[in-house]
Amino acid sequence: MKADIHPVYEAIDATCSCGNVIKTRSTLAAPLSLDVCNECHPFYTGKQKMLDVGGRVDKFKSRFGAFGATKAK
């Protein structure tokens, strides 16, 4: 590798919303915040969990859901 062209690779803490702290290394010098990790993800825990993240479909339904709700006969 060439000297002085690569970014600094530092140790950082990635904190999950459940409180789990993961130590990792990154070129990003600031701590990271994660939504899910292996301690709280439904795939790893086997529990169904509703995440508080609304997608584009939910946003569309909340704005335009009432327009197609009733059908005139």
From Swiss-Prot:
Binds 1 zinc ion per subunit. Transmembrane segments: none annotated. Signal peptide: none annotated. Zn(2+) binds at residues 16, 18, 37, 40. GO terms for molecular function: metal ion binding; rRNA binding; structural constituent of ribosome. Keywords: Metal-binding, Ribonucleoprotein, Ribosomal protein, RNA-binding, rRNA-binding, Zinc. It comes from Pseudomonas syringae pv. syringae (strain B728a). Its cofactor is Zn(2+). GO terms for biological process: translation. Belongs to the bacterial ribosomal protein bL31 family. Type A subfamily. Binds the 23S rRNA. InterPro entries: Ribosomal_bL28/bL31-like_sf (IPR034704), Ribosomal_bL31 (IPR002150), Ribosomal_bL31_A (IPR027491), Ribosomal_bL31_sf (IPR042105). Part of the 50S ribosomal subunit. This is Large ribosomal subunit protein bL31. GO terms for cellular component: ribonucleoprotein complex; ribosome.
